């Protein structure tokens, strides 16, 4: 299971920890959280570790797609969840600055070196004045997780988009939508019952729901309509990928007789053709893997 920042991965990992004890499988959660791109040797080492681990088990990490067959290995079962790109970006923007409901000082733990002027930078200023954090290539975030380790996967454009779509079709058992998480969990329970049996009932448990509220990012504000439209334009390829995955997910749901019971989505944004984008280094995911506190509370 790849973990994409601010796409519900902490909720999923908490569920997996409960399920691993209930069903007797191993859960391996990597303690490396800010290295999604690997050298060839690092890829080979990680593939070796995953391929030789004691089964049955699930492995989770923030890492871009790895092609096991390229190194002579058997391709594993890939699972992932993505989210509306603008909502993901806004959640990450404020999470880096102010954390979540676990405590007022949570943001100080996560970004202790952040300057005050950066921490309190108005989101509209960041977007409208084209600050690096609110511009490409840093907004090109979701697609590289599916495109893979090739350098061109970090360049916003059609090549990375099409390669990401191809990998979704050929290498992923399921790519779900966070906005429809209950249906994602229901499909996982059908596809992989040894791992996910009863996951939906656990997720709906009032105690779990109460804990889930603690991971909600605080102090989020909504950008102006002008700023939102600019984000849509800058995230053109992210949205093309998001809607492609969403359509594939809905096809899968219909195949298994699931009906959507979700709020009406916002209309698709209208995009203009952007000017060529320079390739720079996107920021790494700064979300720390800190779910142990959730697990401990749940077991009290």
Task: Enumerate the predicted regions with their spans.
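A detector of helix-start/N-cap boundary segments at the beginnings of structured domains
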Residues: 1-3, 174-175, 228-229
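PAPS-dependent sulfotransferase catalytic domain
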Residues: 33-80, 87-202, 263
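PAPS-dependent sulfotransferase catalytic core
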Residues: 1-54, 60-65, 98, 148-149, 163, 198-300
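General alpha-helical segment detector with a strong preference for membrane-spanning helices
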Residues: 10-12, 88, 242
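Short, well-ordered alpha-helices that flank and scaffold nucleotide-derived cofactor binding pockets
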Residues: 14-18, 190, 247
């Amino acid at each position: 299971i790849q973990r994409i920042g601010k796409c519900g991965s902490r909720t999923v990992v908490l569920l997996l920890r409960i399920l691993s004890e209930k069903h007797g499988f191993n859960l391996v959660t990597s303690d490396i959280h800010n290295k999604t791109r690997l050298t060839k040797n690092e890829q080979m080492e990680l593939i070796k570790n995953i391929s030789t681990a004691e089964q049955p088990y699930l492995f989770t990490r923030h890492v871009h797609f790895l092609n096991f067959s390229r190194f002579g290995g058997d391709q594993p079962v890939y699972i992932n969840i993505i989210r509306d790109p603008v909502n993901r970006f806004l959640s990450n923007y404020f999470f880096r600055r102010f954390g979540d409901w676990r405590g007022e000082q949570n943001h100080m733990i996560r970004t202790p070196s952040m300057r005050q002027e950066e921490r309190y930078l108005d989101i509209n200023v960041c977007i409208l004045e084209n600050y690096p954090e609110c511009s490409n290539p840093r907004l090109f975030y979701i697609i590289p997780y599916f495109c893979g380790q090739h350098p061109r996967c970090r360049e916003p454009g059609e090549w990375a988009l099409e390669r990401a779509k191809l990998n979704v079709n050929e290498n992923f058992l399921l790519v779900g939508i966070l906005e429809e998480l209950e249906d994602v969990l229901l499909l996982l329970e059908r596809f992989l019952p040894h791992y996910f049996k009863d996951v939906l009932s656990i997720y709906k448990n009032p105690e779990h729901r109460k804990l889930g509220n603690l991971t909600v990012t605080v102090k989020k504000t909504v950008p102006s309509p002008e700023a939102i439209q600019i984000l849509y334009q800058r995230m053109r390829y992210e949205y093309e990928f998001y809607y492609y995955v969403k359509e594939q997910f809905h096809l899968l749901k219909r195949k298994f007789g699931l009906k959507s019971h979700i709020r009406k989505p916002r209309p698709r944004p209208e995009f203009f053709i952007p000017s060529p984008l320079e390739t720079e280094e996107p920021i790494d995911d700064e979300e720390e893997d800190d779910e142990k506190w959730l697990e401990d509370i749940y077991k009290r």
